[in-house]
Amino acid sequence: MADRISTGELGRRPGQGRVDLLLVGDATRYFLAGSVQKFFSSTAQITLTISNVKKVAALLAANSFDIIFLKVTSTLTAEEQEAVRLIRSGKKKNTHLLFAFVIPEKLRGYISDYGADISFNEPLTLEKVNTVINYWKTYFTNTDMGNTELPPECRLYFQTSCSELGGHFPTDLFLCSELLNNDTGLGLKAPLSSPERNKKASFLHSSKEKLRRERIKFCCEQLRTLLPYVKGRKSDVASVIEATVDYVKQVRESLSPAIMAQITESLQSNKRFSKRQMPIELFLPCTATSQRGDAMLTSAFSPVQEIQLLADQGLNVYSMPAAGGPLEEAVRGQPGSVSEDLYKTRVPSTTLSLNSFHAVRYCSGPVSPHEAAARTNQNISIYLPPTGPSVSSFTPQHCNAMLCPTRPASSSCLCTSGHELPASSRTASSSIFRGFRESDSGHQASQQPTGPSLQPQDSSYF
């Protein structure tokens, strides 16, 4: 049931109006409720209703509100979008209704105002609440409340609040109808006319299209880096997309049906790939990652070569943090299965684990002698330089020297003397290593570490 708070007993004076407020959102809406109640307690009689989005329809049908605050913490769900539709429908019947929309800071610039009269970003401050109230008193009420001067105690309270913030008013508050001006008075303009609204809507659409084109440009640059080099191939957007489609088809054909079924099932059951999530990833982990939070672009080396090499050996493909992470023990304890918790954590590397629990893990950058000595006998980590040609360092000759001394009696070890890969794997591996051997010989000498160093940390994009 919705919570109702009334301040009619707090000394209503002549000339004051009655204000009915509705706060809709998650649990953090109670912070806004305290700020609004403290401000109105000296200026008007208020009735404050706090509810969730499921009860908005019943409340709007039974009551007439003056100001409605809608607070969200992520992209709008279907219930929240329905609440917005009901509020906008109620504005047609109630011309004195002000719709205020509180947007999370992390979604600033990526979420629409949904037709709200005034929108502002978190964090919530009393100055923002003050602006909302003054805007409503000026343009959404016909009572004498707009001409009522604030009492001295209320003015003193906001002066103290402003001084505590260093004398700076929030700069991330904006009106959906018009931006704030620099007047010393109210600092607001009247709502825009219909032509001006259409002009602003056109400008907003243009800005969104520009952002979309920038995202496409960034993704194409990343695809150019990830795709194998082909002499004479065009670098325009259409050619890059066509080459990506052909390359993905080639990779899918090289994988066994069991591996493809496992990847498909993992992507379908993973909530990280739902429509509500911001990150967008391809069907192969660590191939291309896009995140909207930061204006940065990171490219992780594709594990396609390792997948092609070990596709017929009954491997499990899953994401895993660096050695010693909290998820490493969970992987060892569940043979032949993929833990759902692993897919909920974004990690910088991709592990290809054999059924014998030998984990061949790669990451960019050199490794210090101390870190190399700390590896256990069940996990052999091969640190490759940050360039693609270094994959050729993982050859069967190197495996005989590194993997076999660890578990010489293991029947599933790929490096046992006399053990040969299937014909399909040999064909795939030979095509992979042939293009990298020449560049690898001159690259290994330049990648020798001169001293202890830290592994580079992956940064997120978007």
UniProtKB/Swiss-Prot annotation:
Residues 200-251 form the bHLH domain. Residues 422-462 are annotated as: Disordered. It comes from Rattus norvegicus. Keywords: Developmental protein, Differentiation, DNA-binding, Nucleus, Oogenesis, Spermatogenesis, Transcription, Transcription regulation. InterPro entries: bHLH_dom, HLH_DNA-bd_sf, TCFL5/SOLH1/2. PROSITE patterns: BHLH. The keyword Transcription applies. SMART domains: HLH. SUPFAM superfamilies: HLH, helix-loop-helix DNA-binding domain. This is Spermatogenesis- and oogenesis-specific basic helix-loop-helix-containing protein 2.
